[in-house]
């Protein structure tokens, strides 16, 4: 393994092969989310991963524009001559989608896990009152925990992580990881209202957990992705953390889509 630092963010590089896969996690995770995935793919690709700025160290919040700029700097360092493959989960999907749409020349294809058209009217309409209340409840709770900060904010965050059955190491979870929710609900650091609707110009493999109280994609968007040449969708019988709950099936599907392995 080798390590580089880009604008204060440490990036780990593991594996071999000309293809570079940049992995972005979400809440309440770190680059450790991808440990098993790196082990499963590093024989065919160079896997690059980072912990999102602010989740453990760095600025308390990173705006959408600054995040896209950082990702551009990272991609230009790790693969200056060829576009990369993005592998995304949770908030990593939101940030990664935006980067891919702003810089389509730097992204060859995308593997996204469990978050699809996050800002679409179709998704909002697909949620009933109970689903909307659930989403509002946990996300605003986490946004408030970030705002409060300190030990109280961290206790609130860990309590929500337990309630949501997050597989992450609870001892590493802090309120610092919640700033995307503050961006979403409080408009912190410019907010997320200017994020573009998710419409990727490159092939997409979208893998999602089928056993959740609500989905983070609309059926309409799923059908649109499935109909695009080169793209595919795959549901697996699990919750939000697909790569943890169903690692063998997830990694087999990814390898099949990326490299045609059966």
Predicted ranges, named:
Residues 33, 48, 53-85, 94-234, ...:
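Flexible "cap/lid" subdomain of the alpha/beta-hydrolase fold that forms the substrate-access gate
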Residues 37, 99, 253-257:
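Hydrophobic residues on the short alpha-helix immediately C-terminal to a glycine-rich phosphate/catalytic loop
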Residues 244-258:
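Post-His helix in hydrolase/transferase enzymes
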């Amino acid at each position: 393994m080798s390590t580089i630092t880009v604008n204060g963010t440490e990036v780990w590089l593991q594996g071999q092969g000309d293809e570079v896969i940049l992995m972005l996690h979400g809440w309440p995770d770190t680059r450790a989310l991808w440990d098993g995935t790196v082990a499963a793919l590093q024989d065919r690709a160079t896997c690059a991963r980072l912990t999102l700025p602010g989740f453990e160290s760095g600025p308390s919040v990173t705006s959408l524009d600054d995040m896209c700029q950082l990702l551009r700097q990272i991609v230009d360092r790790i693969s200056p001559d060829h576009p990369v493959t993005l592998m995304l989960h949770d908030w990593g999907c939101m940030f990664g989608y935006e980067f891919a749409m702003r810089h389509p020349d730097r992204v060859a294809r995308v593997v996204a896990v469990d978050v699809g058209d996050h800002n679409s009217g179709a998704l909002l309409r697909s949620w009933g009152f109970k689903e909307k209340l659930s989403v509002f409840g946990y996300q605003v709770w986490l946004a408030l925990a970030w705002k409060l900060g300190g030990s109280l904010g961290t206790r609130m965050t860990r309590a929500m992580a337990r309630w949501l059955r997050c597989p992450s190491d609870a001892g590493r979870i802090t309120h610092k990881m919640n700033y995307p929710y503050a961006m979403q609900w409080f408009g912190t650091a410019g907010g997320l209202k200017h994020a573009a609707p998710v419409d990727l110009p490159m092939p997409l493999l979208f893998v999602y957990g089928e056993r959740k109280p609500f989905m983070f994609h609309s059926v309409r968007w799923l059908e649109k992705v499935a109909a695009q040449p080169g793209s595919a969708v795959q549901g697996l019988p699990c919750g939000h953390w697909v790569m943890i709950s169903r690692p063998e099936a997830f990694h087999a599907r990814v390898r099949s889509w990326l490299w045609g392995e059966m």
